[in-house]
From Swiss-Prot:
Function recorded in the entry: Polymerizes chitin, a structural polymer of the cell wall and septum, by transferring the sugar moiety of UDP-GlcNAc to the non-reducing end of the growing chitin polymer. ChsV and chsVb do perform additive, but not redundant, functions in septum formation. Involved in cell wall integrity and resistance to antimicrobial plant defense compounds such as the tomato phytoanticipin alpha-tomatine or H(2)O(2), and plays a crucial role in vascular colonization and pathogenicity. Also plays an important role in nuclear sorting or distribution.
Record-listed E.C. numbers: 2.4.1.16
Region (Actin-binding) residue spans: 658-682
Name of the protein: Chitin synthase V
Gene designation per UniProt: chsV
Species assigned in the record: Fusarium oxysporum f. sp. lycopersici (strain 4287 / CBS 123668 / FGSC 9935 / NRRL 34936) (Fusarium vascular wilt of tomato)
Length: 1862
């Protein structure tokens, strides 16, 4: 049969041929096909065809719906519609599933063609359902499409869009549903937008399309975070990306309306927008490193080192509050969660304390999780509303569109790039299979031969990447599941692919760095995959972690408490696959968002019979395989096995979903079409064709090979002969078999050979030929079924959707874990009649505000802060508490409660009460400060008011000479500043020079200013003649300044003489001049002491008296100093009585009582008020000479000496402190001691260097190693900032404990809220060897219950102390113990070999403290010397003294606080603060054994859990070590606490201001509250007034009044600076004595460096004594209050409620040691009887519980033994100090030790075998060089097993053989 290719195009040039296979054979190369495409492109024909199977579309970067003539004919849209028509015809007439697969690079226009195709398909069913399906596609694109460097609409998620049809009733398929399956959204883009690209479009839609009211609600109005006009959003890239030609505002409206038409309620749309806004705000969070200034609410209190804990906090709290409100959580919880991250490391939960960069990444994880879950929820909700039940779906049309091949990843995510390229590789392989291999088997079975066509086969790459089990993605998933490292993954790839697969090359895991001769780990290692589109290098660094895509349990735990139902639904959907704790199924450890869709293609999940399949053997085999696959899929999905979530990472899930796509497309019942989208150029230039660019794409996709294949075999269908003949109306051909008749028909049709072939049982046809015989031309509409089958009756008027009830079908959902309801209810299911749903609900959203009538952001925030509380305790307030509360309300009554709640933002009543208490305490403190200030300044001024008076001698000292204090003069009792007046003297130096004026300085110049008597005095009659004059007194007498005599008239007086008789009379001139002097230049008044006034009257006969503090002199008046003087030229008038103008009674007073204070007489003088007023005016203006000087009066002397007495008393305390510091003599050398001591270190997040220094310093102490026990308590599984391992692992590595030792966690009581009182811990023990010291140790690791996700086990330093205190308390009182305490007892007694009761002392240091080698010895010596000593501390110095200015100012303060304050308190045997960083306590009394430090009262008070008042918070959360000392003084008042300067340690002081401020706030406030606790105690010892109570009171008072003291010093300095004549000598002498005595101390101790430190300390006094106290007092309530609170109950009771649940003490079983020991003894004895091998007798003892449950309940797996040997009988026998009552080897049931476990003995060689081999080795070994270690290594080589567990036996056997004992 001749082959001919029909011309499918019309007449014209070559470009008119749209079908590439129709071109001549010589034009079938890449170059020629590219040229052909170019010729079509240039005439606006951007499409071509590969027969009927595929469309080739070139992106014109213009309107894709316009063809060459302006219509759609010839356009890309027309090509897509043609494919839609073909698919729809095949769907309706053959009931085949249809699939359209898109291929092309990014920017080739796949999304556009896909949209045209979908529109064309949906237009064939113009119903509301089709509209919804179209809108669903728009929603998908909005959520998953972005703008990249190559295209403005780049899809970043694989799409499998399934349109569901019912084809059972008619050849016109009925659209009944749809399904959107998204595959692997590019999540890395959310938090890391590439430069020059955009994030997903919907985020920009939200920002551009919301109204102002909506923006305000969402916090998008730019009012927060920055002060700039345009806010830069981190997650939206560069601001230029907001304006790139995309109409985002319109897009948002369409998006919103699409959701509404898809039946999303308005509230849900608003919630969606809030989540999107939250994601934007998460990008705005700014983090900083700070110090935790307050104890967290669920913490027991205390800090494990000086200062505080370094944490990461959010800077912009306003942004944080917006996010928290929308997520329905509290802002504090959100900040805490972002600052920590919990991981699983070696099967342990570990919380990492993140730095700001880590917190930023954690916030990015939250953003990615929110967006991924939101997309998954929206799509699943759409699917629930649009997807038809599987049983009703007859056929489907699937659109497959995955992102294009990616040569380089813009987001930096190697995983996204790998999975993306894996998908393109798979889809390309599907394409090749469809054209080259799909019909090959059937052609062969039908005995049809087709000429082979060569093509590029990417099967190697597909197998290498996608093969289940050992493909690249499977290996990546397997390595992720096994927690392998990146390098281990690389090695796994090498073993799998090296030399076995040409498509994958594995790079080297090691590399030689420049300048190095050694191979090191290659941090830039890659593996290379040869994809069909080119080679790509994939870095392995971080790939394993990225593939895990772990969402930390912290985020899940936070969201678990959300008050937002919508957020709960997001995190409750199956897309979130959770991993639960193996022992606590309700606890989610971590999770991941699924990388595969929640549904499978209907082809994969439908069990109905697929019609239209040929019944050949091959097809039957395929059908059976598919049905079997369906059954397996259904069974696997129905189980909903949570293990799936544990088994599969992102690559495994994506591989499974890709496999579903592959099987759906290659299903025998599926007909596939392909759309090749090509870019005409790389620069996105419209109408420009780059031949090189296009040829590369044609070559990459193998279009030339496909075209050649179609030229030889273009078969689309296989029709059995009967069906074929029935369709061709071949009844007229009556002769021949079916085959012959078919051949005759084909010959008659003259179809080309490549489109039709006759096989053994049927005919292979192209789609064109089939359409011809089926009479399906362009205008053909066939209503019936082909093949003569009767059509169903569809005349009932109902669509299939209407004729059946659609329920929620979830059979096809992929399992999402076994806890779908953890975060809320499942999403609503169900779908109702598709075409009858009203769309009237789609309307405007609240008039431009979709949040109208919904909760405001403030309401959301308030709801997020609410906690679900449960009653846990009931109690009554103590009377003292009631009295205090009454006082608080009395002091703060004027502050209304609502003001505190609203303005202070304190919704909780207990927090408001604490704030009131703080205010009340501050008021009391300031009252005391005011009293102190009053006594220092106000009291002397009140008793002796300050007088501005000058005696004659003082005035004379102001003579203006060099060295004098100034130039003052006196005028009628008033002292004037001459220096100030001279510059303003009129008429200036022209008349009287300045020197002349200065000659008057220091003198009384009253004579210079003659007075007009009549102008200054009205006399007794109301008028005095103007001629009356009064001479001025000459006061030039002994002891007085040189004054001008009245008779020696000064020549300058004439310038001031304006009396009546002069020619220039000015009566008021003197008054006016004096007014100016008094108000401008007045410095004071002349002062005359009462004694001196009497002397003047007695010795000089002055008529001088004192009236109300004023001194008057009437001597001249009485001695005739008055006369009349008329104007020149006029006679002197004779006026009787003119010079007698004063009342006789007044004159008589001066005569009879001169020298006396006549105030009383003056008050009783018999004058009318008018006359008395006149007389007083005359006295003041004419006879006043000064004030009474009382500065040396008795009253003033009392005020001075009263203050001096107080100063002396305080100075005496200073002297005692000085003497106390001196009384310590030199250091004596202590003797060797035999007391047992526990050395405890509480560890939290310290670095390895600090921990090692602390541990080594304790181990190297000069004290018998076997009598000290090193106890390290690790407070939780936490990785501190800067650490690479959790703190417990660091400690265990230092101590040499192998990672293989993993004891069972055991329960014990902790200090926490509610259920957090139940904690679990692990016990490790062993020997630590350092510098010749071998010290037994025990490590207690608090790991927390399985239900604890964040910071597991962490309860605070006080709880760490209580672990040991409670244990020792129960040991000494023989009380029942918890499982962990029993294990501690066992480890100490049977492993370490010392009875716990033997330990007498507890030595406690911090993890950053280093102790001197003799410190423990000196402290224990003091305990032995004084049996009444209960506790002591030593001197603590700084190791980082020169670290910063902050540390420098603390050096001297540390030194004097010990050597003065503590030394002084030690005199009385009551040191009020024993620092937790360096103290030793007496556990029990030496004589009686009575518990002291661990007595019931102290343990009970110190373990207080209910810390709900301000006082208790300050006691237990700020100064737990000081409170512990307070309890010792309170309950053991007969015992002493001392300070030993000979014991020394060094610690690290805060080196930053924030940490220093935090530390001092805690110290100052705890000091105030602890001293307040001590003052009421009646048992405080002491003698006379120097009792301990007095010392405590002085300490408390000095702490409180520090700010006033500083202010007083400033006041003194000001006084000296402003008035040099007044120097408070006493005050400065005291200040000098304070520091002088301190200097004496460090000089005597030869601490010369303290001179410099003292100067720095003095400079910092304002900080220490003023700034810090003020800050501390006001921040007294600065706490994280947790969620436990107190509410009022009935009958005056208080109810404690907590969100941590109620703790049941019975949940922790307890046993006495004797009972526990008896059980162990019985079990051990039985085991020893049954076990032949005594070496492992400890094994069955340790695993005596045969059932599935632990001895202590809880349903956990039986524990495994942790250790079976103690210190070893040969080498460590000296350690067996206490008799062991355990038979056999010492073994731990639960604890871990560094020796070996019975598990390690399984499979070990026997001792006899080892001994024989050792003999053999020693026979040939060089005995001069052989070592035990070498023998052990040789034995391990021979037996091929590690022999660490047999080390002790090997060593002892070797010694025995060498010594001849064996």
């Amino acid at each position: 049969m001749a082959m001919s290719l029909p011309q499918l195009g019309g007449a014209g040039g070559p470009h008119t041929q749209p079908s590439l296979p129709s071109l001549p054979a010589h034009l079938q190369s890449d170059t020629h096909l590219t040229a052909h495409l170019a010729s079509r492109f240039h005439v606006s024909h951007p499409t071509a065809r590969l027969s009927s199977h595929a469309l080739i579309s070139l992106n014109t970067y213009t309107n894709s719906s316009k063809g060459p003539d302006g219509g759609k004919e010839g356009s890309a849209m027309a090509g897509a519609e043609e494919i839609a028509d073909r698919a729809f015809l095949r769907l309706g007439h053959r009931s085949e599933n249809q699939a359209v697969v898109f291929l092309g690079e990014s920017g080739a226009g796949k999304s556009t063609i896909r949209a045209h195709l979908l529109t064309a398909l949906l237009n064939k069913s113009s119903t509301p359902l089709s509209t919804k399906l179209s809108l669903a596609a728009y929603v998908f694109d909005s959520l998953t499409t972005t703008k990249t460097a190559t295209t403005p609409t780049a899809s970043k998620s694989g799409l499998f869009y399934e349109l569901q049809y019912d084809t059972s009733a008619t050849t016109n398929p009925v659209l009944i549903g749809g399904k959107l399956l998204d595959h692997r959204l590019e999540r890395s883009r959310i938090a890391d937008v590439p430069t020059g690209e955009r994030n997903f479009h919907v985020l920009y839609y939200l920002l551009a399309g919301t109204s102002e009211a909506e923006k305000s609600h969402l916090g998008l109005d730019g009012g927060s975070a920055t002060g700039t006009t345009q806010k830069r959003w981190k997650y939206l890239g560069h601001p230029t990306q907001l304006k790139v030609g995309i109409n985002d505002a319109e897009g948002f409206q369409v998006f919103k309306n699409a959701l509404r038409k898809l039946e999303f309620p308005r509230a849900e749309i608003a919630e969606i927008c809030q989540i999107l806004a939250s994601i934007l705000h998460i990008g705005q969070l700014e983090f900083e490193t700070t110090s935790q200034t307050s104890v967290t609410g669920d913490d027991s209190g205390g800090f494990s080192h000086e200062g505080g804990t370094t944490i990461t906090a959010v800077k912009n709290k306003d942004v944080l509050s917006i996010i928290a409100a929308f997520l329905g959580v509290s802002a504090a919880d959100l900040q805490t969660t972002l600052g920590y991250k919990t991981k699983m490391i070696h099967r342990e939960r570990v919380t990492v304390m993140l730095d700001p960069n880590g917190a930023r990444a954690h916030a990015g994880e939250l953003a990615r999780t929110l967006y991924s879950l939101l997309v998954a929820w929206i799509l699943e909700t759409i699917n629930q509303r649009l997807c038809a039940p599987e049983e009703s779906i007859a056929n489907t049309v699937s659109i497959v569109d995955f992102p294009g091949f990616c040569q380089q990843t813009p987001t930096g995510s190697a995983l996204d790039q790998l999975l993306n390229n894996a998908a393109t590789e798979c889809i390309y392989n599907l394409t090749l299979q469809n054209f080259f291999d799909r019909k090959a088997d059937m052609l062969e079975s039908e005995e049809v031969s087709v000429a082979a066509t060569s093509y590029f086969d990417n099967s190697d790459a597909v197998r290498g990447i996608l093969k289940p089990g050992n493909g690249l993605l499977s290996i990546l998933d397997d390595q992720t599941r096994r927690n392998r490292t990146d390098m281990q993954f690389l090695e796994a790839l090498r073993r799998r692919f090296d030399g076995k697969n040409a498509a994958i090359e594995v790079g080297s895991a090691q590399a030689k760095l420049p300048g190095s001769n050694f191979m090191t780990e290659n941090t830039s290692a890659v593996f290379t995959v040869k994809h069909f589109a080119g080679e790509v290098d994939y870095p392995v660094k971080g790939l394993i972690e990225e593939n895990g895509e772990i969402i930390s349990g912290d985020l899940l735990n936070m969201i678990n408490g959300t008050k937002s139902e919508f957020v709960a639904r997001l995190f409750g959907q199956d897309a979130l696959q959770t991993v639960t704790h193996p022992n606590e199924r309700t606890t989610v450890m971590q999770a991941t968002v699924s990388s595969k869709p929640m549904r499978a293609p209907s082809v994969m999940s439908r069990k109905t019979h697929r019609t239209g399949r040929p019944s050949t053997a091959y097809k039957r085999q395929q059908q059976e395989a598919m049905e079997e696959l369906d059954q397996q899929s259904q069974a696997g999905e129905s189980k909903k096995n949570a293990k799936m979530t544990l088994e599969q990472g992102a690559s495994g899930q994506f591989l499974a979903s890709l496999d579903n796509v592959q099987k759906a497309v290659t299903d025998p019942g599926t007909n596939s079409y392909f759309v090749f989208c090509l870019k005409p150029n790389d620069r996105r230039i419209a109408n420009q064709f780059d031949s090189k660019c296009v040829r590369m794409q044609v070559q990459t996709f193998g279009i030339a090979e496909i075209s050649q294949r179609l030229r030889s075999a273009d078969f689309s269908l296989f029709l059995p002969f009967g069906e074929f003949l029935g369709m061709t109306d071949a009844e007229t051909i009556l002769v021949g078999s079916e085959r012959e008749r078919a051949e005759m028909v084909i010959e008659e049709k003259q179809w080309p050979q490549n489109e039709v072939r006759v096989g053994a049982t049927g005919v292979f046809l192209s789609e064109r030929c089939w359409m011809e015989i089926a009479q399906l031309g362009e205008a053909v509409s066939v209503s019936g079924r082909y093949g003569g089958l009767p059509s169903s009756d569809a005349g009932d008027g109902l669509t299939p959707a209407e004729s059946m009830a659609f329920g929620a079908s979830k059979e096809h959902l992929v399992s999402g874990g076994n806890t779908p309801l953890m975060y809320g209810e499942k999403a609503k299911g169900g779908y109702f009649t598709d075409d009858t749903r009203s769309e009237a609900g789609v309307s405007a959203f609240g008039g431009g505000d979709m949040f109208k009538n919904l909760d405001t952001r403030e309401q959301m925030a308030e709801r997020g802060n609410e906690k679900s509380l449960e009653e846990v305790e009931e109690y009554r307030d103590k009377p003292s508490r009631k009295r205090w509360v009454a006082l608080v309300f009395f002091l703060t009554w004027f502050i209304p409660d609502f003001a505190i709640r609203l303005i202070g933002r304190m919704p909780r009543k207990d927090v408001r009460m604490a704030w009131r208490e703080k205010v009340a305490i501050n008021m009391l403190i300031w009252l005391m400060c005011a009293v102190a200030a009053f006594f220092m300044v106000g009291f002397p001024m009140l008793i002796c008011p300050k007088q501005y008076v000058y005696s004659s001698n003082e005035l004379s000292s102001y003579d203006g000479d060099k060295g004098s204090k100034g130039a003052y003069v006196a005028i009628r009792g008033f002292v004037i500043d001459l220096n100030a007046f001279i510059p303003n003297h009129y008429p200036g130096s022209n008349l009287v020079s300045e020197d002349t004026l200065l000659n008057y300085a220091g003198k009384d110049i009253s004579a210079l200013f003659p007075i007009q008597v009549s102008a200054l005095c009205q006399g007794k009659d109301g008028q005095i003649p103007p001629e009356v004059t009064l001479d001025n007194r000459n006061t030039n007498i002994t002891g007085q300044p040189q004054l001008l005599a009245s008779r020696d008239i000064d020549v300058n007086s004439v310038y001031h003489d304006f009396r009546y008789f002069t020619n220039d009379s000015r009566p008021d001139w003197y008054f006016e001049q004096m007014y100016t002097f008094k108000h401008v230049y007045l410095k004071g008044r002349m002062g005359y002491s009462p004694k001196y006034v009497k002397k003047l009257a007695r010795d000089s006969s002055w008529n001088v008296v004192t009236i109300h503090g004023k001194v008057y002199d009437m001597t001249k008046y009485l001695q005739g100093g008055l006369r009349l003087k008329a104007k020149a030229g006029k006679p002197t008038p004779n006026i009787p009585g003119a010079t007698d103008f004063m009342e006789d009674s007044v004159v008589q007073l001066f005569r009879s009582a001169k020298g006396q204070d006549v105030s009383k007489y003056w008050d009783n003088i018999k004058l009318s008020p008018v006359k008395k007023q006149r007389m007083e005016t005359c006295l003041n203006n004419l006879f006043y000479i000064g004030d009474s000087d009382t500065r040396n009066s008795t009253r003033c002397q009392f005020a001075t000496y009263f203050i001096l007495a107080i100063s002396v008393m305080l100075a005496s305390i200073l002297v005692f402190k000085f003497l106390a510091a001196l009384q310590f003599g030199g250091k004596n050398v202590p003797e060797n001691l035999d007391k047992f001591v526990m050395c405890m270190i509480p560890a939290y997040t310290e670095d390895e260097d600090s921990l090692r220094r602390a541990i080594d310093s304790l181990s190297r102490m000069k004290y018998d190693d076997k009598r000290k026990l090193l106890v390290v308590v690790c407070d939780g599984m936490i990785i501190g900032q800067g650490n690479d391992r959790p703190t417990p692992r660091i400690v265990l590595d230092i101590l040499g404990v192998s990672e293989t030792v993993d004891p069972e966690p055991l329960s014990f009581e902790s200090l926490g809220e509610g259920m957090k009182q139940h904690n679990m811990g692990k016990i490790y023990s062993g020997l630590y060897e350092v510098q010749g010291h071998i010290v037994p140790f025990m490590v207690i690791v608090k790991v927390g219950k399985p239900s604890e996700v964040s910071r597991p086990g962490n309860r605070g330093k006080r709880d760490s102390q209580m672990v040991l205190m409670r244990f020792l308390n129960r040991v000494h009182y023989n009380l029942a113990m918890s499982p962990m305490e029993l294990e501690m007892y066992h480890q100490i007694r049977n492993i370490i070999g010392v009875n716990p009761t033997f330990y007498e002392y507890l030595f406690q240091i911090d993890a950053d403290t280093v102790v001197a080698a003799d410190s423990a010895t000196r402290m224990i010596s003091a305990f032995i010397d004084d049996t009444r000593l209960i506790a002591c501390c030593g001197e603590t110095a700084l190791t980082n003294a020169k670290g910063s200015f902050i540390t420098m100012i603390q050096v001297y303060e540390y030194w004097i606080s010990h050597n003065l304050s503590k030394a002084f308190e030690s005199l009385f045997g009551s040191v009020t603060c024993l620092p937790g960083c360096f103290s030793m306590y007496r556990i029990r009394a030496a004589e009686t054994g009575k518990p002291l430090f661990v007595s019931k009262e102290i343990v009970e008070d110190y373990s207080t859990i209910r810390v709900d008042t301000l006082h208790m918070k300050n006691l237990l959360h700020l100064g737990e070590d000081r409170y512990l000392t307070t309890l010792l003084l309170k309950y053991h008042s007969k015992y002493k606490t001392k300070y030993l300067f000979s014991a020394q340690a060094w610690t690290i002081a805060p080196d930053s201001w924030s940490v220093f401020l935090s530390q001092r706030r805690r110290w100052i406030n705890s000091t105030v509250h602890n001293l307040a606790e001590l003052i009421p105690l009646a048992q405080l010892c002491g003698f006379c007034c120097f009792s301990m109570r007095f010392v405590v009171f002085i300490d408390l008072l000095s702490t409180i009044v520090q700010p006033v003291i500083v202010m007083y010093i400033v006041y003194l300095i000001y006084q000296v600076a402003t008035n040099p004549s007044v120097v408070p000598i006493t005050a400065f002498l005291l200040l000098g004595a304070i520091y002088g005595l301190q200097a004496v101390i460090f000089i005597l101790r030869r601490k010369w460096e303290m001179v410099g430190w003292m100067i720095m300390y003095i400079a910092a006094i304002p900080v220490f004594s003023f700034g810090l106290p003020l800050y501390s007092f006001w921040h007294m309530d600065d706490f994280n209050w947790g969620n436990t609170r107190v509410i009022a109950g009935e009958a005056g009771k208080k109810i404690v409620v907590s969100d941590e649940g109620k703790f049941d003490p019975n949940s922790i079983p307890r046993k006495k040691w004797e009972e526990y020991q008896a059980e162990l003894w019985e079990t051990q004895t039985q085991t020893a009887r049954d076990d032949v091998r005594s070496e492992i007798s400890g094994y069955s003892y340790a695993t005596k519980a045969q059932g599935p449950f632990s001895e202590y309940g809880g349903g956990y797996q039986p524990s495994r033994p942790g250790s079976t040997a103690g210190f070893g009988h040969q080498n460590m026998s000296r350690m067996s100090l206490a008799h062991s009552e355990m038979p056999g080897n010492r073994a731990s049931q639960f604890g871990g030790s560094q020796f070996f476990s019975p598990e390690d003995l399984v499979g070990m060689p026997s001792d006899d075998a080892l001994l024989a081999e050792i003999r053999d080795i020693l026979k040939t070994a060089d005995l001069m060089t052989v070592t035990k270690k070498g023998i052990k290594q040789e034995l391990e080589r021979r037996f091929n097993v590690p022999l660490d567990a047999k080390r002790a036996y090997i060593n002892s056997a070797t010694e025995a053989l060498l010594s001849g004992q064996l």
